[in-house]
Amino acid sequence: MAALPASLADLEWIISRLAQRRALLTPLAPIFWRPASDASERHRAFIEHLLTEGGGLAYRTADSVLVASPRGDGWLVDDLHVRDGRWTPDGIELWNALAADRGGQDVRFVCPTYERDRAAFASSIGLTVAETWWLIELGTGGGEARLDVALPGARAITVGAPPVYAPPGPMLFLPSPENAATAVPAALDQAPELGCAGVVVNQVASDQELVETLRAAGLRPHCDYFTGTIKTF
């Protein structure tokens, strides 16, 4: 089956496929990706809104699905599940269907670092890593999201999870540390006091010096963000 546009008639099928992917990811970061008790219902509401009022696009094959969300002047591709690793032909067919509708536009492609085949696919369609989120999960929680936190060497914010996930607290997120050598240890000290369930640090691809600081502090690469232009392959 070649990739075709998906519609609300496919909604239950889409949610079931995306739930399969969520089940694969959860053990890899069980705090960050702890699913909400009603994760499928929440995901259904989000996808339904996206396809009706949110300007989103969806495509499917017999077993695989891609959902693209508008993002600024381009698109975000996060909800993409290819069954049994069939990036060829399913992944290519889904991507080409998106390219037929939105070719030439910018895209941000979400790729957890644990999904190596997904990363290889992203590279094969001409995308490159722009940023990486580094993560350390903590055993704390109960904090409040959307708090600005001043750290020595960085500005941070407590960030709540997307609705489908329910970690015990927000993540303390450092989007652009100016002095990681002081900011990261301070973040690790303050995160439990703030009731955060983890610390996430954004590393732009060009900042390789930051990598050693993050590794030494116990963080691991968690999610790559590829960027590029949508085009046919």
Language model features with spans:
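A short beta-loop-alpha structural element at the N-terminal edge
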Residues: A2-T26, E144-A154
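Conserved GNAT-fold acetyl-CoA-binding loop/helix
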Residues: A23-A45
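Conserved beta-strand in the GNAT
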Residues: G55-R71, P152-P163
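Conserved acyl-CoA
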Residues: D90-D106, T128, T182-A197
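Conserved beta-strand-loop-alpha-helix junction that forms the acyl-donor binding cleft
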Residues: L94-L98, R108-R118, S176-P177, V200-E209, ...
